[in-house]
C-alpha cells in the first residue's frame, strides 16, 4: 500500500512538472519589424530635417496581441510632439489598412528641444475585431508570396504646430523575422524589391512591465495634450543612432544595441529576454486546478 501511494505521488510530480514546463516555456509568437523615419512616404509631402528609427514587435499574448515599440528621433522638438500612431498596412504615400492605434509612451521617454526618444507597449484584447484583423494580416504580410508585397505597417508622428491631420514624419515598418511561428516569410522594401534586414532578438523584460499598456481593443488616448509632456517625433529617411543613445533598455524592444566609439556605429543582436509576465500569471489558476484534480483522482483511487 505504501509503495502504491509513493508511486502515485511520483506520477503526480511528473505530471505537474511537465505541465509547468509547457506552460512557462518561452514559446510566444513574435513578429519583428523595423523602419526609418522620413518624409518620402508621407501622403502630404513635407520638408524637414527629422531623422530616426523605429522598432516594433507584435507578440501573441493570452489570446490577444501585444505591441511593443520604440522610436528614436532627432531634428525635432520633442516637446512639440502631439501624437504617434501605428497604422496600416499601406503602401508609401497612401493611407490605408484597418489598424489604427495611438501609441502611449512610458515614463522613460526623453523629450528635448532637439530629439524624441521613447518606447512603450499596448495590448489588444482577445476576440476583438482588431485582434482578429491582426491575426489574419500577420499571415498575409509576413508571407513571401504576400499580396501585401508593397504594403507595410507604418508609424506617423504629428506635432501641435502642424496639427494631428498633418504628420511631419512617417516610417514604413519592414518585416524582419518571427519566432515560434510556422511562418518565416521574407520582408519587402517599400519599392517592392526583396531586401530582408537581419532578424532581431526577443522582447526585452522592460517591455513587459510598461505601466502605460492598454488591455482594450480600442486605441489609447494620445500622449498628453500639453506640449511639455506629449511625445511626437518627426522624420527623415536616415536613422541617427549616434546621437540617440540612452541608458534605457526600452529604446530597442527588438534587442538591438548601438555603440558609438568615435565615428563608428555597430549593432549586435541580443539573445536574451523574458516572456511577458502576464502569461505566467494567467497560467497559475490553471496549474492550481490541474493539481487539485490530480490529487482528487489519487485520493478516490
Curated annotation (Swiss-Prot):
The protein's name in its UniProt record: Uncharacterized transmembrane protein DDB_G0282061
Q: Which residues form the signal peptide?
A: 1-25
Q: Which organism is it from?
A: Dictyostelium discoideum
Where is the stretch described as Disordered?
174-281
**What keywords would UniProt list here?**
Glycoprotein, Membrane, Signal, Transmembrane, Transmembrane helix
- Main subcellular location of this protein, as a coarse class: membrane
Query: What ranges are annotated Cytoplasmic (topological domains)?
Result: 301
Lineage: superkingdom: Eukaryota
**Where found?**
Membrane
> Which residues are tagged as glycosylated in the record?
191, 212, 234, 241
Show the stretches that span the lipid bilayer: 280-300
The residues exposed to the Extracellular compartment are 26-279
